Amino acid sequence: MGQDLNLAFSISATSRPPRGTERDGVEYFFLTPEEFRQRIANGEFLEYEEVYKDRFYGTLKAQVEKQLEAGQNVVFDVDVHGGCRIKEFYGDRALSMFIQPPSVEELRRRLESRGTDTPEVIDDRIARAEYELTFAPKFDTIAVSYTHLRAHETRSNL
């Protein structure tokens, strides 16, 4: 990803078990719920979220600092709360981008066309998206995801 800009994704921590061929320190840092809670108590996370009971996801400060010290520009794929926390921590050193669908109706169409979720799950995801859309003004820039290719072009033009 982004050799000319030296972009690299952050590696998140999670308390869920590895799936398939996932490796610790590559796709995620895999922690037990107890280890995750201890690191929260120690202030080691830039941001974190308990998505379900004992199912945490978060970004470790030390990992991001290691990437920054290596000269990488770190890209985070986080929810709106995480994005706001990271921006608050790094201030002007961070560029926050909110990626949104062209409309809620288009998002619903995309979710339905996948054929992977029940109508109830889609309704829950739409409700979550509507909530998250209220955070868009807090971000430095907003990119509309018309298609994967156009979203990439928008990112490249920043």
For every predicted segment, state its role.
Residues 19-21, 84-86, 104-110:
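Switch/connector loops and helix/strand junctions flanking conserved nucleotide-binding motifs
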Residues 66-69, 88-92, 134-136:
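Conserved catalytic network of the ASCE P-loop NTPase/AAA+ motor domain
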Residues 76-78, 90-111:
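Conserved phosphate-donor/acceptor-positioning beta-strand/loop module used by diverse small-molecule
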Residues 14-74, 80-84:
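ATP-dependent small-molecule kinase phosphotransfer cores
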Residues 147-154:
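Conserved small/polar residues in nucleotide/adenosyl-binding loops
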Residues 1-5:
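A conserved segment at the C-terminal end of the G1
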Residues 45-46, 110-117:
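Conserved AAA+ ATPase "sensor/coupling" helix adjacent to the nucleotide-binding pocket
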